[in-house]
A protein has these predicted regions:
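Sec-dependent bacterial lipoprotein signal peptides
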Residues: 1-6
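Post-signal peptide N-terminal segment of mature Sec-exported envelope proteins
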Residues: 17-33
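Extracytoplasmic
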Residues: 22-24, 38, 84-86
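Extracytosolic low-complexity repeat regions of secreted or lipid-anchored proteins
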Residues: 76-124
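Beta-strand secondary-structure signal
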Residues: 24-28, 42, 88-90, 99
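Mature extracytoplasmic domains of secretory-pathway proteins
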Residues: 44-89
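Bacterial signal peptide processing site
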Residues: 7-12
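N-terminal first-folded block
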Residues: 28-50
Length: 124
C-alpha cells in the first residue's frame, strides 16, 4: 500500500498509555513488482517480538486513535505516488482483530502509512 504525504486524515492523539496498549501483530513489507524478499516482524505489547525498539512502537501505537483504520470511503485524496511498497499488518490490537494493508498509492494512503511508519523499519 502507499504512504500518504498529505494530511487527508484527521485522527488525533489517544489517551492510551504504553502500559494499557496490548498487541499481538504480524507485520510484513513487500515491494510490488519486485523479487526482493519480503521483510517481516512481530510486535507484542507489552513490548516484545522481532520489531526493533518494540517498547517505543508500543508506546507510539498507544498514542494514536485507531491506528489501523482505513481511509474513510469517499475521502478526496491527492493523486501522488509514494512508492511501490505494500505493508500488511494482522493480529490483534487492544482486543480488536487487525487485518489491513498499507500502501503509498495516493496522498491519503501516504498519510496513513506515515502515522504507523515506525512499524515498517528501513522503508523510507
Amino acid at each position: 500500500m502507499a504512504l500518504a504525504a498529505t494530511g487527508c486524515m484527521s485522527r488525533g492523539e489517544s489517551n492510551n498509555s504504553e502500559s494499557s496498549t496490548t498487541a499481538d501483530l504480524e507485520i510484513s513489507v513487500s515491494i510490488r513488482g519486485s523479487e526482493a524478499p519480503t521483510k517481516s516482524w512481530t510486535l507484542h505489547c507489552p513490548p516484545g517480538g522481532t520489531l526493533p525498539d518494540a517498547a517505543a512502537a508500543c508506546s507510539k501505537l498507544g498514542q494514536i486513535d485507531d491506528p489501523f483504520a482505513p481511509v474513510p470511503e469517499g475521502t478526496a485524496c491527492t493523486q501522488i505516488f509514494g512508492g511501490p511498497e505494500i505493508a500488511a499488518v494482522s493480529g490483534t490490537f487492544n482486543g480488536k482483530r487487525v487485518d489491513t494493508e498499507f500502501s503509498r498509492g495516493n496522498g491519503c494512503e501516504i498519510e496513513r502509512w506515515k502515522r504507523v511508519g515506525f512499524l515498517f523499519p528501513g522503508v523510507s
